[in-house]
Curated annotation (Swiss-Prot):
GO cellular component terms, semicolon-separated: cytosol
Organism expressing this protein natively: Streptococcus equi subsp. zooepidemicus (strain MGCS10565)
Main EC class the enzyme belongs to: ligase
Entries under HAMAP family matching the protein: Leu_tRNA_synth_B (MF_00049_B)
Protein name: Leucine--tRNA ligase
Length: 833
């Protein structure tokens, strides 16, 4: 039987594309543009897994489709190659992280090319290349000049095992680090911060301008966390000190019965009484060992210590004890809260635990039993009594402003971005600290500030990066003789990925980040595909940097990515025991369609789970390509289900995709291809062109492939295949299975040219209309025959044809036809006596 020999055909076409630079980005200014971007990978030692190609195949289908539609297409690939894993590996093995990274990139590139993706490799970038990070550093110097990069002594998330501080976003809900799962403790350190908060309102508002999944927009909105309320100033009794509280409910001020400061609040030590000093100091020590997420966990037991001091409630003059508690964060709001236990669950639980006063100020509920968190008419609230929420807030804010103890305020949950890492393998921060106490950015002509090569990359142990050990690199002298010391912190991995999509546009430019006219031509990115796990971090950081560059006049658009799409996860085959525990696949025995634990004999339930080394269910694309071919992998991953769904990997599904491609190969290579159109496939072909075109545009790749299958089935029923329909079908197939598409195109045309730029087929609406219809002929309501007749045949003609049919003639022989009921295009019912 004829079949598609992927081992011969796929390498042949990959070599053809490389030799001919088939996918070089188009530069014809008269053509429309299409910029298709993948989230570039971190080149790990493990190489690609089958989850990577899902998103890459989707952008590749769109890129091939748009090229055929006459677009200039920019479809690049590169490497997000700085980061902790390479450094950790280097420390464990003694190898240079640069060498390790280069080897991994070579392996990734080999795997990617084996899958037939149409990348323009002339635009390949690598975040660890000095010619690339020169511009990462340049952006940092611009942030510094604008006051958006600054140094601060801040409590950081310190991970001893990693020897570095990490951002809030990199701490998991259980209080461990995203990288490695290590304990995270709070520790005050000198750090570089980026003032992303200055862009909070724009980052929020401009989400309305992009075509992104609403779920991702909501995650960003929640992270930015805008809230409107008031700042209220509380004086500390018997002192000249005060503190400010931000509250979204200033109308409940009459119900504030105590105040809580974050343990790190600057006021704590100075207001704590001698009797409470030891307890406060011990509580502060314990709080420093917890992450922000662990501290704010709603389910955890409430803890706190009284400082011995009192605040004065400005609205009624009452004394309020001042406590410290770890659920209040110094980094959020003002680091202090007014507690209204009658109407806040956390404050109520705290008040109950420590026997603090609870005063209801809203009608409804029983505050002895639980906090009342609904709206209600104000009570026990002096001049606010009888008012609803909105009126009471307005009146209280006016009172606060009149009396000078508060004012209206918009607050954000978003914090400034902790930007420095105490590690070696990252971009050096281009700042010099001089002995006269000043700091300056490295001038543009001296960039890049190259990361020095060293064998000693272990953390210094002092909280500084390993760069602090390299005296020759570290120490500098100015022309006027003033000595200085280079910044030893490096940038986080997020730096290089915050702007890489811009460098693809002009990757070899030594004079500027990218040419302005080219940026104007290509921005914004038309489609950006990647995992939803980057919803907050990477996407928010990239939007921030883009807006800064927009303000500097570097980029012409407010937003970087016009359309975002998150592909689903490809899950691995896995098994669970009766407790729900996952069992590694090499411990499972399959017998008679059931699954059993090899060691215990227990019958297991098959349950898809995320692919992992520990479960031994990771599928390597190299193995799939070897056995089935790259086109099979591509078609299978696109046919599994909707692109955004998480679906389990299936060997049977892979075999089904392969059988389909073999059927396509046989159809084109063994069917008689003819120059005359019989018309038999008109409707099937034009329906397929219309459907596949629309479904690619809508990224419904699974239904597009289903439509291709429908056409193959229809074509196989005919004795011959019209050559124009054969060519058109191969063009529709080519974005999904490009190697087979090229091979079949040569069989049909012998052109020696790639199919890539052949104009995309179009459909003819008139061919979508059925010219014939099937008519049911009944006698006394029972079906006796079915006829195929011309559509819209008249009642008289339909009656004549029905009565003349052989079967009907036999049924009515010798009987009198009393009546004939005709429903055009549907049925003829004959009534006989």
């Amino acid at each position: 039987m004829t079949f598609y020999n992927h081992k011969a055909i796929e390498p042949k076409w990959q070599a053809f594309w490389a030799d001919n630079h088939t996918f070089k980005t188009g530069t014809d200014a008269s053509k429309p543009k299409f910029y298709a971007l993948d989230m570039f990978p971190y080149p790990s030692g493990a190489g690609l897994h089958v989850g990577h190609p899902e998103g890459y195949t989707a952008t590749d289908i769109l890129s091939r489709f748009k090229r055929a539609q006459g677009y200039n297409v920019l479809h690049p690939m590169g490497w997000d190659a700085f980061g902790l894993p390479a450094e950790q590996y280097a420390m464990d093995t003694g190898n240079d992280p640069a060498e390790f990274t280069a080897e991994n990139i070579a392996n990734f590139k080999r795997q990617i090319n084996a899958l037939g993706f149409s990348y323009d490799w002339d635009r390949e970038i690598n975040t660890t290349d000095p010619s690339y990070y020169k511009w990462t550093q340049w952006i940092f110097t611009k942030l510094y000049e604008k006051g958006l990069a600054y140094e601060a002594e801040v409590p950081v998330n310190w991970v001893e095992e990693l020897g570095t501080a990490i951002a809030n976003e990199e701490v998991l809900p259980d209080g461990t680090s995203e990288r490695g799962g290590y304990p995270v403790v709070r520790k005050p350190m000198r750090q570089w911060m980026l003032k992303i908060t200055a862009y909070a309102e724009r980052l929020l508002a401009d989400l309305e301008e992009v075509d992104w999944p609403e779920s991702i927009k909501d995650m960003q909105r929640n992270w930015i966390g805008k809230s409107t309320g008031a700042n209220v100033t509380f004086k500390v009794k018997d002192t000249d000190k005060d503190f400010t509280v931000f509250t979204t409910r200033p109308d409940t001020l009459f119900g504030a019965t105590y105040a809580v400061l974050a343990p790190e609040h600057a006021l704590v030590d100075s207001i704590t009484t001698a009797e409470q000093a030891a307890a406060v100091a011990e509580y502060k020590r314990q709080a420093s060992l917890k992450s922000d997420l662990a501290r704010t966990d709603l389910a955890k037991e409430k803890t706190g210590v009284w400082t011995g001091a009192y605040a004065i409630n400005p609205v009624n003059g009452k004394e309020m004890p001042i406590w410290i508690a770890d659920y209040v964060l110094a980094s959020y709001g003002t680091g202090a809260i007014m507690a209204v236990p009658a109407h806040d669950e956390r404050d109520w639980a705290f008040a109950k635990q420590f026997n603090l006063e609870i005063i209801p100020v809203l009608e409804g509920g029983n505050v002895d039993e639980a906090a009342y968190t609904e709206d209600g008419i104000h009570i026990n609230s002096g001049f606010l009594d009888g008012l609803d929420k909105a009126c009471a807030i307005t009146k209280m804010v006016a009172w606060l402003e009149e009396t000078g103890v508060g004012h209206e305020k918009v607050s954000y949950r978003l914090r400034d971005w902790l930007f420095s890492r105490q590690r070696y393998w990252g971009e050096p921060i281009p700042i010099i600290h001089w002995e006269d106490g000043t700091s300056t950015a490295v001038p543009e002509q001296d960039l890049p500030l190259v990361l020095p090569v060293t064998k000693d990359i272990r953390p210094s142990g002092t909280g500084e990066s390993p760069l602090a050990n390299l005296t020759d690199w570290l120490e500098v002298t100015r022309e006027d003789g003033v000595k200085g010391r280079r910044e030893t912190n490096t940038m986080p991995q997020w730096a290089g990925s915050s702007w890489y999509y811009l460098r693809y546009i002009d990757p070899h430019n030594d004079e500027q980040l990218a040419d302005k006219d080219l940026l104007k031509q290509w921005l914004p990115v038309d489609i950006y595909i990647g995992g939803a796990e980057h919803a907050v971090l990477h996407l928010l950081y990239a939007r921030f940097w883009h807006k800064v560059l927009y303000d500097l006049g570097v980029v012409p658009t407010k937003e970087p990515f016009q359309k975002l799409f998150n592909q689903g996860m490809i899950l691995g085959t896995s098994y669970r025991d009766h407790r729900g525990a996952l069992v590694a696949t090499d411990k499972v025995d399959k017998r008679d369609g059931s699954f059993f634990h090899m060691e215990t004999g227990e019958e297991l339930e098959q349950a898809p789970a995320k692919m992992s080394k520990s479960l031994k269910n990771v599928v390597n694309p190299d193995d799939v390509v070897e056995q089935y071919g790259a086109d099979t992998l591509r078609v299978y991953e696109m046919f599994m289900g909707p692109l955004d769904a998480s679906i389990a990997w299936s060997e049977e599904g892979l075999e089904g995709a392969r059988k389909f491609l073999d059927r396509v190969y046989r159809l084109i290579t063994t069917k008689e291809i003819v120059a005359e159109n019989s018309g038999a496939l008109d409707k099937a072909y034009h329906e397929t062109v219309k459907a596949v075109t629309e479904q690619i545009e809508g990224m419904k790749f699974n239904t597009a492939i289903a439509q291709l299958m429908i056409f193959v089935n229809a074509a196989n029923k005919e004795d011959e295949l019209y050559v124009a329909y054969a060519k058109g079908f191969v063009q529709l197939l080519a974005p999904f299975a490009p190697h087979l598409g090229e091979e079949l195109w040569q069989i049909l045309t012998a052109s020696g040219q790639s199919i890539s730029y052949v104009a995309w087929p179009t459909h003819d609406d008139s061919k979508l209309v059925e010219n014939d219809v099937e008519i049911v002929v009944q006698i006394k309501g029972k079906v006796k025959a079915k006829l195929v007749v011309a559509k819209d045949l008249s009642r008289e003609e339909l009656e004549k044809v029905a009565l003349a049919h052989d079967k009907i003639q036999a049924e009515i022989a010798g009987k009198e036809v009393a009546k004939v009921i005709v429903v055009p295009n549907k049925l003829v019912n004959i009534v006989v006596k």
